[in-house]
């Protein structure tokens, strides 16, 4: 059962440190809330809004509630293989994954001109900031598309309860998503001064619907979400190709690709609200209660946060249900 900390704050967190709790309490006092702040099972301290929280707002958006890795999420592909059909020695697969999926801080593919896939060409540039992008940022967009990144991002070959082989991947919008988010959070601070927003934390500054700064953020956020989705798709294609190199009869049977750092405008009880979610990795299902009293949620824990291993770039580490994991540098 959730813990109702106050009328505007509900927590499902089994462990919540004092810093994260104080941060969530500050968020719960914002005047733009459309419902209570909800903390997920492993919520923890972050920039402005708590990582592992859902913060629904009305007529405004809170960039820090979306997070600095806009569109970060998971993609999982089920294959026709079972554990018994995998090679006994997975070193070759590990090497292929390392070669085909760049991992680590700032890592990407070669030169920009060699990485302009049709998906990337169709994506274009972030519309809210296109005129302000430097040549280096434009290059970063190209060379980092199809790369893992750092922190708790990973690609993993694992097994389900039927011993069916899956590939699971965790990544987001890479350097450009972080840069866009950081720039818009700074803009929100300036807007807060203009609007005389009363803030307990300047990183809880919001953008009011109808302002040009709001429109610019939404357009860039949606672009970064598409970039992150495509980034995961490209890496998953590369990972499956690597798997087929060691198991040629492997067939992809289904794929699930979803964000967990995002915002979407939804209608609840006849009222339009923005639902930013800055939540750890894992499946999530949410429904808005008819009384608009709270968000209900059922979800798994974060991807590698609570039980993370500090490893060198792209080193295999064991995980529950895992055959092999390619882990980015922490």
Per-segment meaning from a language model:
Residues 2-23, 32-39, 45-51, 55, ...:
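Domain-length cofactor-binding catalytic modules of enzymes
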Residues 28:
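Beta-strand elements of modular eukaryotic interaction domains
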Residues 65-128:
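A generic, well-ordered mixed alpha/beta core segment in the N-terminal half of proteins
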Residues 41-42, 69:
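Acidic active-site catalytic centers that drive phospho-/nucleotidyl reactions
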């Amino acid at each position: 059962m959730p813990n109702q900390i106050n009328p505007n704050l509900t927590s499902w967190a089994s462990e919540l440190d004092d810093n994260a709790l104080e941060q969530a309490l500050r968020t719960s006092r914002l005047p733009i809330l459309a419902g209570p702040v909800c903390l997920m099972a492993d919520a923890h301290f972050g920039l402005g809004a708590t990582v592992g929280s859902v913060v629904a707002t009305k007529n405004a958006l809170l960039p820090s509630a979306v997070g600095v890795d806009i569109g970060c999420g998971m993609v999982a592909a089920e294959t026709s293989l079972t554990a018994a059909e995998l090679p006994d020695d997975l070193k070759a697969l590990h090497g292929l994954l390392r070669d085909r999926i760049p991992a680590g801080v700032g890592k990407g593919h070669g030169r920009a001109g060699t990485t302009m896939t049709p998906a990337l060409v169709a994506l274009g540039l972030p519309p809210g900031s296109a005129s302000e992008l430097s040549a280096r940022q434009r290059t970063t967009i190209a060379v980092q598309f199809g790369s893992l990144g750092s922190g708790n991002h990973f690609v993993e070959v694992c097994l389900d309860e039927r011993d069916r082989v899956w590939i699971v991947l965790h990544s987001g919008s890479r350097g450009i998503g972080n840069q866009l988010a950081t720039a818009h959070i700074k803009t929100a601070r300036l807007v807060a001064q203009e609007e005389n927003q009363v803030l307990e934390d300047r990183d809880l500054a919001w953008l009011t619907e109808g302002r040009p700064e709001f429109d610019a953020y939404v357009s860039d956020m949606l672009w970064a979400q598409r970039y992150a989705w495509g980034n995961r798709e490209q890496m998953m294609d590369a990972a499956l190709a690597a798997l087929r190199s060691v198991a040629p009869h492997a067939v992809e049977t289904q794929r699930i690709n979803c964000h967990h750092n995002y915002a979407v405008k939804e209608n609840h009880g006849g009222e339009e609200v923005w639902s930013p979610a800055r939540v750890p990795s894992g499946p999530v299902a949410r429904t808005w209660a008819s009384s608009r009293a709270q968000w209900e949620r059922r979800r798994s824990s974060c991807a590698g946060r609570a039980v993370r291993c500090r490893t060198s770039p792209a080193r295999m580490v064991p995980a529950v249900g895992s055959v092999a994991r390619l882990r980015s540098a922490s």
